[in-house]
Design a protein with these regions (language model features):
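N-terminal beta1-alpha1 cap of cysteine-dependent amidohydrolase-like domains
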Residues: 1-125, 136, 143, 147-181, ...
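Active-site loop->helix "elbow" adjoining a glycine-rich segment at hydrolase catalytic centers
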Residues: 129-131, 138
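Active-site-proximal beta-strand elements of phosphoester/diester hydrolases
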Residues: 228-231
Length: 278
């Protein structure tokens, strides 16, 4: 498949901070990994997914001569996957609690990836943490903990239910996201986050908000290339029999892949269709 798109996925990072009882060997090493659902979501006909290992030159993660710009030059698009909190230091704050310290090493790595792909005009899509990282990279800030800092907030995370935690979102009328779902003013999405966008970056516009608390759920860049972030996990949208009004992730994926094909200059195969609202 010489014409296959090559989509990079940012890595989660496991840091062996302290010995884990009952574990050893590989768990004493720094690990780069991804959750398989996000890879399976990206893998479509004529699309290959590759995890991009961190190439941090300072701190715990070291690299040779390869740079993030080399990946951006070779790959056709970037998915910033979910995971651990963003460190408050990445947006000019200090942690309000030790549990909200986040991962500064991963922040630097993913911000570098983000900047490299944007500089190349390659499309970028952010999922959950990835959406928050886009906002931070462009100058915005976050709620370190929505329940603590926003009294009117609904439940955005339930560890016991995880991806089975759903709530309603409203699509902003006239937005490109709304255009992907004709006739859909609101829908259900899964919700697995306790942080969220507080101050929106100047170059972003809001495309979806949570109902009824108004927490920002989707953003898009006003710049020249494709850049979209969503607070939910489209790769986890699987419980359709229980949530028939959930937002189908296929139109968003198709738009992202179309942007990658346009940037590369290749024709598109048949669009993905998963079968939910939209």
């Amino acid at each position: 498949m010489s014409d296959a798109l090559l989509i990079g996925i940012s890595a989660r990072i496991y840091h062996p901070v302290a010995p884990v009882p009952g574990f050893g060997g590989i768990f004493n090493k720094t690990l780069h990994y991804l959750e398989q659902s996000v890879a399976h979501w990206v893998l479509q006909p004529h699309v290959l997914a590759l995890m991009i290992p961190p190439v941090e030159r300072e701190g715990l993660v070291q690299a040779g001569q390869m740079s993030l710009a080399d990946y951006a030059e070779r790959l056709d698009g970037l998915v910033l996957q979910g995971g651990t909190d963003i460190a408050p230091e990445s947006y000019g704050e200090t942690p309000l609690a030790p549990d909200w310290s986040g991962d500064r090493i991963r922040d630097r790595y993913e911000i570098g990836l983000f900047e490299a792909f944007v500089a190349q005009g390659k499309p970028v899509i952010g999922i959950c943490r990835g959406c928050q990282l886009i906002n931070v990279a462009l100058g915005g800030t976050l709620y370190q903990d929505i329940p603590t800092q926003l009294d009117s907030a609904i439940a955005h995370r339930d560890d016991a239910r995880f991806e089975s935690q759903f709530h309603e979102v409203s699509l902003v009328a006239g937005s490109r996201l709304a255009a992907l779902y004709p006739g859909v003013a609101s829908a259900e999405i899964n919700s697995i986050h306790h942080q969220g966008i507080k101050v929106l970056a100047p170059d972003l516009e809001v495309e979806a908000v949570a109902v009824p608390d108004g927490v920002i759920e989707a953003v898009r860049w006003r710049g020249p290339s494709y850049l979209f972030g969503m607070q939910w996990h489209p790769e986890f949208m699987v419980q359709r029999q229980f949530h028939p009004n959930q937002l189908d992730g296929a139109p968003i994926l198709n738009e992202f892949l179309a942007a990658a094909r346009t940037r590369r200059g290749v024709s598109a195969p048949s669009a993905v269709r998963l079968g939910a609202v939209g």
